[in-house]
């Protein structure tokens, strides 16, 4: 087969053959196989060229994908599949990228966890879930998590939540709110409870009463549209109790309110 045409198309070259076949190749392919117009290729040479062309093209795609941020082996492989790179070529590309240290799942997991320690708010359970979603194996994640101290991060997150809600909730409800938020963010129950020890939940009676008055007004506006009489009183009591207010304080307020 003879090459009848070589035409540059943006980042690729169009190769046309005298058997009406055509293919796109990278500049690396042109150089490696010393391609030029009128060059004759046998079947083996053509197959070698096609394999190298897809390998070169796929690797360039992968490097472009990696130029934005670190990626896992799986993320790179999935990206190449979207661009219709063949599976055996993908395997070769992944191997090359690993050997050249462009991709490293263990390093990616370590960087991800360290960045979270600096400016994130996730606990180990959520971090592991997110890394697994990236296709990183547990054996690359677990050793790093086990060596990472999350106590200071839990304290920082709990302090931020405390500052946000301390003027809106009574002590019991505030503790429950912070604990639940930490659990949702992936911290263990023990770590969540321990982080509360560094916070001051003391509120004087007037502060608690003011919060109760405000919440009672809010719940009354909401519930009085649907209920009245004894049923309204019961609904108000239940709503306030769920918010963490003391039963005696609630009953006292309701007697004077209704």
UniProtKB/Swiss-Prot annotation:
Segments passing through the bilayer: none
Domain of life: Bacteria
Pfam families tied to this protein: RecX_HTH1 (PF21982), RecX_HTH2 (PF02631), RecX_HTH3 (PF21981)
Keyword Cytoplasm attached: yes
GO CC term, one of those recorded: cytoplasm
Record GO biological process: regulation of DNA repair
Alphabetic keyword roster: Cytoplasm
Compartmental location: Cytoplasm
UniProt keyword annotation of Cytoplasm present: yes
Annotated family: Belongs to the RecX family.
Entry function: Modulates RecA activity.
The protein, known as: Regulatory protein RecX
Annotated source species: Streptococcus pyogenes serotype M28 (strain MGAS6180)
Underlying gene: recX
